Design a protein with these regions (language model features):
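Non-catalytic protein-protein interaction scaffold segments in large eukaryotic complex-forming proteins
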Residues: 306-394, 400-403
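Signature of exported/secreted
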Residues: 17-336, 373-377, 397, 408
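Short inter-helical turns and helix N-cap capping residues of alpha-solenoid HEAT/ARM repeat scaffolds
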Residues: 367-370, 399-403, 436-437, 485-486, ...
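Classical eukaryotic N-terminal signal peptides for Sec-dependent ER targeting/secretion
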Residues: 1-17, 23-25
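Alpha-helical adaptor scaffolds
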Residues: 517-518, 526-552, 556
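Alpha-solenoid HEAT/ARM repeat scaffold
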Residues: 373, 404-407, 438-442, 487-491, ...
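Long internal repeat-built scaffold domains in very large eukaryotic proteins
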Residues: 324-325, 329-359, 369, 385, ...
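Helix-rich alpha-solenoid scaffolding regions
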Residues: 363-457, 464-470
């Protein structure tokens, strides 16, 4: 909620416009007023102060750092135009410049004093510069050669203060800020306010990098306003204030801010005899060059930007040294922790600034053998020309021993939101080669499709869209060539279609969903659900209706429940809800699918109030609100629980467990963020099993014999993972009864065993904020996720019980900086967020006489640590000021309730 001061500031220009709208001055009057200012033959001396302060976000109360430049500004109109008073040639001369910073003796903001510092500002040329001023606009500057871009941009900032209008009006102005909309409001006879917004950045700035998903961009709030005071012939006082604040979407206090204040105040007026007599402006400039014996360069007010990264200063950290310093952070034991995510950012930065030879040297160094797969993670995160070339020259796609390194590189690359098209094409070429294993072929093709889809979404050019479309066609062709009984081949390309998310694939997926076998139909239906409501047209909903109610043929229960989930998330009508509830009350269906369908109805009602009201109406009108329909007896569950609700972000844990024979047939735990009514899928961890029919007689006491295909399927269990919308190939734990019993007798899973590990980049943000004073603020943010999903299971055939735990551990580090880098001084604010998300799923089962199954989902206690560091370096001086503030915010854990039957089972087991 905005503060009262924020609301007052926002309403102030509007209030002025309302008060003054009764007597507006026409534009011609404004031109006449401004035309009488700065008559020829008079010199005006101003006291000039330009202040720049940088600090943390507004929620961070620590003192800011900053500097200011003070001096005297001489202004004179040296050309009395004969044709119109609207044209002037202003001479601007900045004299006696001084750089000032805060005194170290000052301990707080109230009493802080600026003091003079020795600096390179003494090297500024003592030459005037000239502005072509026309009716309140600076058309061009005429400047002699300067010693630095800092000086040149500073002069443009000074000249920008002389852009003004003296009546109520809207104008478009070009300045150091770019092309901006400016609103002028007359406060009284001699004061005009100025409000600047809607700026389009100058084309002279480098390209920016912004994630297509708003939640990963963060928020930049800007405000620019000024005052112009004048008398009958000159400006008396001009000020222009601006404030910019960036914060991450996750925590307002993690970010940085910069403020700038330009101020000139008239101190003295004296005669000026240096007047040029010329008939035209061009002739006046020519005479001026002769008189000063200088060559004047014509410029506009756009900033000239110089990239001042570590390469500019020849100070880049050497990759081998950075890897050595953060070696222990990248060990397997640190995965899933914030320590590895923090170190990963440092290593990725070093990789980006390294050549191919240097990267290969680090990869082949024996000292890095224990972190080699993590290094390939980071090469995939960096994903530039050099890192990709080094990876391709050190990875052997024909060697089965390289599978882990290859997959880790490809998984990390597939999540990168801004891949290069050249890299995608190079990987695409490898897909047609003879590869070492089906795992590599699966991962490689899915990586290419995921990267192409992300590129087309991020950079919506014809070339990128064409590549994505070509891959859709290629994937469909490969899918068509798969044998009907080759599920592995079919599923590989269905996963590729899920990564591409293209409407062209809908028809094929619907066909597999309705006519495929139990495995392919469920995957096809799940892929359609992943596409989201944007692609669920009437045709999709029609197929879902047929599949759920089995109007064409008998369908797999997983396929049916996914189809029902799509229907219920598509604003269902009265008739659909009526038919679903009637189906719940009808006999003949296996009760676990009914339990799951009931859970879906409850979840729909929790998430959508309109659908909830409609469901209540159906239950009352159709007299269906009774035990037979609304009180099923199964263990299946489907629910979502909030684990965070902060800063307009809602974090949800979504759990889905479809039970068959007392065992999870298909389940998933999803982590979802909601921001500004948009959902972002962070991670989905799924599990599937078949053929564990041994438990049926213990679980189902109804006496009915299972006649479905489920009972005759081989014993299988596997895991599947979706990270940031990218489908990773599944991991098969066992695929036969023999393998299962081998694990049981050997106790394979009794120790904690990694399922999937890796480090990937989730945030990359580069933004430039030009200031009115001529300085450009550079905002750079990176975020890494270190993931470790591990499992452990213990089973006793003697005691007939089992315990298992699956841990999803994610370490997150977000590091950013706001830098104001000039030849005089560098001000920098570094901010970071460090945290860990630990989500554990516990299961306890007893199956001596009857199955008792207790499942718990636990969000473990954790901390969120924020760090803000501020530093200032005056170039040419040895000292550098530096302050750091660290805060830790505890986050309480919680255990999420499932359904009533599971709770009763938990009470039974834990009471013994």
């Amino acid at each position: 909620m905005a503060s009262s001061s924020d609301r007052t500031a926002a309403a102030y220009p509007l209030l002025l416009l309302l008060l003054l709208s009764s007597s507006p001055l026409p534009c011609s009057a404004s031109a006449a007023d401004s035309g009488r200012l700065f008559p020829a033959g008079v010199q005006y001396e101003y006291e000039s102060t330009t202040t720049v302060l940088a600090g943390g976000s507004s929620d961070n109360r620590d003192p800011a750092i900053g500097h200011r430049v003070v001096g005297r500004l001489l202004v004179a109109n040296i050309w009395p135009a004969t044709d119109t008073a609207g044209d002037k040639l202003l001479m601007l001369h900045f004299k006696s410049p001084k750089l000032q910073t805060w005194s170290k003796k000052s301990k707080n903001d109230v009493n802080r004093q600026f003091i003079d510092r020795k600096s390179r500002i003494d090297r500024f040329s003592d030459q005037p510069f000239f502005a072509h001023w026309r009716n309140g606009h600076i058309e061009n500057l005429y400047v002699s050669s300067t010693n630095s871009l800092t000086e040149e941009n500073f002069k443009k900032g000074i000249a920008g203060l002389f852009q003004f209008q003296l009546s109520n009006q809207h104008a478009v102005e070009y300045s150091t800020l770019g092309e901006c909309n400016v609103t002028y409001s007359k406060i009284n006879q001699n004061i005009v306010s100025k409000l600047v917004d809607g700026c389009v950045l100058p084309t002279t700035l480098p390209p920016e990098i912004k994630h297509p998903d708003k939640i990963w961009q963060g928020t930049l709030r800007s405000k620019r306003e000024g005052l112009v005071k004048y008398n009958h012939e000159s400006l008396v006082d001009v000020s222009l204030d601006e404030y910019h604040e960036f914060s991450t979407s996750f925590m307002n206090e993690v970010g940085a801010s910069v403020s700038s204040k330009q101020h000139i105040e008239l101190k003295e007026t004296k005669p000026n005899d240096d007047v040029i007599k010329a008939n035209t402006f061009k002739e006046a400039i020519h005479q001026l060059e002769k008189q000063l014996k200088l060559k004047l360069e014509k410029q506009n007010l756009s900033l000239k930007h110089e990239v001042k990264n570590c390469k500019h200063y020849n100070s880049c950290n050497k990759l081998d040294e950075v890897v050595y310093n953060y070696h222990d952070s990248l060990l397997d034991s640190e995965l899933g922790k914030s320590k590895s995510a923090y170190g990963a950012i440092k290593v990725v930065d070093a990789i980006v600034n390294s050549d191919t030879k240097t990267i290969k040297k680090v990869l082949t160094d024996e000292k890095n053998e224990d972190i080699i797969v993590q290094l390939y993670d980071l090469l995939g995160a960096a994903l530039n020309e050099n890192s990709h070339k080094a990876s391709m020259e050190t990875l052997d796609f024909t060697n089965a021993k390289s599978v882990e390194k290859i997959e880790r590189y490809l998984w990390s690359a597939s999540i990168n939101f801004n891949p290069k098209i050249e890299i995608i094409k190079s990987l695409l070429a490898i897909t047609d080669e003879n590869l070492a294993s089906k795992k590599i072929a699966d991962t490689l093709f899915n990586t290419v499709t995921a990267m192409a889809s992300r590129l087309a979404r991020y950079n919506h050019t014809d070339t990128n869209i064409l590549l994505s479309g070509e891959l859709v066609v290629k994937t469909l062709e490969k899918l068509e060539k798969c044998k009907l009984d080759d599920d592995e081949c079919i599923l590989t390309y269905i996963r590729a279609l899920s990564n591409l998310k293209h409407p062209l694939s809908i028809e094929v997926l619907l066909s597999f969903a309705q006519h495929g076998n139990r495995k392919t139909s469920a995957y096809a239906m799940k892929t359609i659900k992943m596409f989201g409501p944007g692609l669920w047209d009437s045709r999709v909903l029609k197929y879902c209706n047929r599949i759920f109610f089995q109007l064409v043929k008998e369908q797999d229960s997983s396929t049916r429940t996914i189809a029902l989930a799509i229907l219920l998330e598509s604003n269902p009508d009265y008739d659909l809800l009526k038919h679903v509830v009637e189906w719940l009350a009808a006999p003949g269906e296996e009760y676990e699918i009914k339990q799951y369908a009931l859970e879906l109805l409850k979840e729909m009602a929790n998430q959508n109030e309109t659908s909830a009201r409609l469901l209540r109406t159906v239950l009352v009108r159709e007299r269906l609100n009774h035990y037979g329909s609304m009180a099923q007896r199964g263990l299946s569950s489907c629910f979502s629980r909030k684990f965070i609700n902060y800063n307009n972000i809602t974090g949800l844990v979504k759990n889905s467990q479809q039970i068959y024979s007392g065992v999870t047939k298909r389940g998933s735990v999803d982590i979802v963020l909601e921001h500004d009514s948009v959902k972002y899928d962070l991670c989905s961890f799924g599990m599937f099993t078949t053929g564990l029919g041994y438990f049926t007689s213990l679980y189902d006491d109804s006496g009915k014999k299972d006649t479905s295909d489920e009972a005759n399927l081989p014993a299988t269990a596997g895991l599947e993972l979706i990270v940031f919308g990218v489908h990773i190939r599944p991991f098969i734990m066992f695929s036969s009864q023999g393998q299962l019993m081998g694990h049981v007798w050997a106790g394979t899973g009794s120790d904690k065993t990694p399922i999937i590990q890796g480090i990937s980049q989730m945030i990359e943000h580069l933004e430039y904020v030009p200031l009115s004073n001529g300085i450009t603020a550079e905002l750079n943010v990176k975020g890494m996720l270190s993931l470790d999903i591990s499992g452990q299971i213990e089973m006793s055939l003697w005691n007939k019980n089992a315990q298992s735990v699956i841990e999803k551990n994610g370490g997150v580090s977000i590091q950013g900086s706001l830098k104001l880098d000039t030849d005089l001084v560098t001000d920098e604010v570094d901010f970071s967020l460090i945290t860990e998300g630990l989500l554990h799923m516990h299961s306890d089962a007893e199956f001596a006489t009857k199955i008792v199954l207790c499942m718990r989902i636990v969000f473990v206690d954790t901390n969120v640590t924020t760090i803000v560091s501020k530093s200032e370096k005056v170039h040419g001086l040895p000292h550098k000021s530096h302050t750091t503030t660290t805060r830790t915010h505890p986050v309480s854990g919680r255990t999420f309730a499932l359904n009533q039957m599971v709770n009763e089972f938990c009470n039974t087991i834990h009471s013994r």
